[in-house]
Structure formats: C-alpha cells, structure tokens
Amino acid sequence: MSEQSSVVVIGAGLAGTEAAWQVAKAGVPVTLWEMRPFKRSPAHHSSEFAELVCSNSFGALSSDRAAGLLQEELRRLGSLVIQTADHHSVPAGGALAVDRGRYSAALTSALDDHPLVTIRREEQLTLPDPDQIAVLATGPLTSEALADDLRAFTGREDCHFFDAASPIVEGESIDMTKAFRASRYDKGDADYINCPMDQDQFLAFRAALLDAEQAELKDFDQNSATFFEGCLPIEELARRGEDTMRYGPLKPIGLWDPRWGDVNDRDVRRAKRAYAVVQLRQEDKDGRLWNLVGFQTNLKWGEQKRVLRLIPGLEQADFVRFGVMHRNTFLEAPELLEPTLQFRRRPHLLAAGQITGTEGYAAAVAGGWLAGTNAARLVHGHDPMQLPHTTMIGALTHFISEAPSGKFQPMPPNFGLMPQLQECIREKRARYGAYRDRALADLQRTIDESQVDNVVCTA
C-alpha cells in the first residue's frame, strides 16, 4: 500500500455509494461524507443513500440498448448499486425500475454495516488535502460552499443545466374505468397504466399547460435557462408545438385498450385509437404508487394538481409528490479529467457521477465504479485502469475526457460514442447486438487481465 492508506468519498448518491463500496471491497478503509439529513438539496426528500430524485427507472434492460448494455457491464463488474436494483426491481415493461424506498434503504444498510466504511453525516465544505486520495461524487446539486472551493481549484466557472422530476400519484385514486393496463406493443406484461385522450381532451390539456403558472427558479436568469434535452419539462414540450408531446411521452402508438374492440380490425382501430396517451409507471413493489412518465415539470404545486387532473382517469388523483425542478452543475470535464476520472492537476482527486458530465443513473453508477476502483488501486500502489473504448463505460469516460472543450454538454450512454464495427451491418438491432457482443468480450478480457474483483454482492 501507499503511504496514503485510506480514501475519502464525498457524496452518497449513486456514484458515491458505488465508489465507497468498491473501495471497501478492495480492502481499503473509506470515509463517506453525506450532508443529508442536516442539509438537504432542493431535490432530495430523504436521508438515504442513492436516492433517486427524478425517475425510478434505470432505462431499458435489453443489452442491445445503450442503457441496458451499460447495466450489463456493471453487473459483470460486480456493481453493488446495479445488483441491488435488480433485487428491488418493480414491473416496468422492458426497463429496470426500482422501488425507491426499499432500494435506497438497502444500499444505506449495506454501507452502514461494512466494517471498512465510516459514515460522516455532515457537509464537506472544501476539497480534501492534495495528498488525500478522494472521490468527488457530490452530484449535480453540489453544495454552495464546496462548489465555490471547486471553482477556485479548477479556475473555471461550472457549467449547468436545469433538470426536473415527475409527480407521483396513489394507484387507488386512478379511475380504471377510463385508464387501462398495457405495455407498448404488448411487450411483456401489462406493466403501465395508460390514460388515453381524444383530440379535444389533448388540446384542452395542452392549453392548460401553456397557461399554468410556473414556480420561480432561484439563482438563474429565466430567459437563459438551459434544459437537458433528455429530461425536458412537460410544459417546455407543450411550448415547442402542438404535436411535440404526441411524438414524445404522450405518443399513442402501440397502446390499445381491449374494451375498444378488436385491434386487428382496421375500421375499429381507426375509429377508436387514442389521439394521445399518458403513461404511469409503477414506483413501489406493492403497486400503490405510480409516476407520470415523462412529466418532469416546474409548475407550481397547485397548478400541477389542477392541470394534471384534466388527464382522463386522473380527475380524482391523490398526489403523494409533486414535480420539482433544480439546477444541475457539471464540470468542464474535457479540460479537467483523464479517462481514469482523475483530475489532471491533482491525480489523487477523482470525480464520479453526474458532476462529470455523464447523464443518467446507470452512467453515474459507472463513474462511481471506475473512480472507486481507481482510488483503491492508487492506495495499493497500482496504476489506475481505463476500460476499453469499445465498452459503453469506456466510451463514456473517453468522451467526457476528450470531447471538444468550450461547448461541452452532458452525454447519456449511446452507441454513437463507440468505435465503428469492422463490418457494415445495416439492420439496427443486429448492429447494436454486434456492439454489445464486442463490448462484453472486451470487458471480460479486461476483467481477466486486470484481476477485477467482480464477485456478486447484493444489499
């Protein structure tokens, strides 16, 4: 081991939780700092680790999808956070979604019970000493004091965009005489509740969205607010055009209520098909709570209740959580980070999670895995590792460290980040399958060569 025989991890979100676990699993003592519950961000509701503040979904499960491939790579690397998500999953069609409460509680208990993990429930006001091996995993809602110190260290103003979370309603309050259970194109079980609209209902709903009063966002210019395109507020989609929502979260294609008649009868299909459909996804194991898919919003809470109750089936909906919007901060990673997630100016300091400019839950976990693994390797006196560019994790970390600087924006996992295949495959699913096969083969080779400890450990 090096003279520095312990690691500090700041932030117990998805990335910090994974990082701390990987450090401890490598036999290295780790101190995990988390400011909650004594100081909360605008988006958090609990003091549990790895709280999911937006959706409860990690994205598609299928490994020929970008998010699904990222999840599968993490499973094979022994990710605690992903394996725990598998254990606490709820029905969500072809996606990996979890019971938020049980999921976060399980991860909190796993770290609390680990003999090498020390938890400090207080705010970290400054970056650790330069000689301290540390992982910065404070997320997009980094506290003001630490953000100020980070700006002083990097010599740069942080970048930011605005993100939002969807409302959640009680399942018993949904009128199932108007709504119906189904998954799109009948894939898998009928895991979603669907609220169909005709054209008049949709236009009235859109008009109400456009007229609704928004909550005031602090510390930013309303006219220059930047949103992440993958998580736009529903009212922003409404502003972009009459059909924008219908080609986004409210698209009706592939959803049919058997009460309408025979879907294979063309005349029935033309007469009965919905103009738009609002989908709700299960939040908990018992199916008592449901979130409105794609309904991130910054409307005032009273306005949310008024407008969302215009949706057929939700006229008497009981809201257990309203949508909120918050500022997301991220680093100018191409200027600051190596593909190992070390800061170029301070190799003992690593960054992980959404603060690095990756987008999505699974990407945050991936950053936590790599930063935690490399922090432990530094303690043991080993060189930090990179994952192959042909893996989804490697493609993401290479992108954020090598992208053109100046206009850097958060990036979700996608196959466009990966090196092209040697052979030309025109059919998309087959092409994505080939990307997957190459990625998993190269990942296994790296696991074998680097002696990665990928023992399955679930909370």
Curated annotation (Swiss-Prot):
FAD binds at G11, A12, G13, L14, A15, G16. It catalyses: uridine(54) in tRNA + (6R)-5,10-methylene-5,6,7,8-tetrahydrofolate + NADH + H(+) = 5-methyluridine(54) in tRNA + (6S)-5,6,7,8-tetrahydrofolate + NAD(+); uridine(54) in tRNA + (6R)-5,10-methylene-5,6,7,8-tetrahydrofolate + NADPH + H(+) = 5-methyluridine(54) in tRNA + (6S)-5,6,7,8-tetrahydrofolate + NADP(+). Gene3D superfamilies: FAD/NAD(P)-binding domain (3.50.50.60). Its cofactor is FAD. GO terms for biological process: tRNA methylation; tRNA wobble uridine modification. Keywords: Cytoplasm, FAD, Flavoprotein, Methyltransferase, NAD, NADP, Transferase, tRNA processing. It is an enzyme of class 2 (transferase). InterPro entries: FAD/NAD-bd_sf, MnmG-rel, MnmG_N, TrmFO. It holds the Pfam family GIDA. Its EC number is 2.1.1.74. GO terms for cellular component: cytosol. It is found in: Cytoplasm. GO terms for molecular function: flavin adenine dinucleotide binding; tRNA (uracil(54)-C5)-methyltransferase activity, 5,10-methylenetetrahydrofolate-dependent. NCBIfam families: gid_trmFO, PRK05335.1. Catalyzes the folate-dependent formation of 5-methyl-uridine at position 54 (M-5-U54) in all tRNAs. Belongs to the MnmG family. TrmFO subfamily. This is Methylenetetrahydrofolate--tRNA-(uracil-5-)-methyltransferase TrmFO. It comes from Synechococcus sp. (strain CC9311). The gene is trmFO.
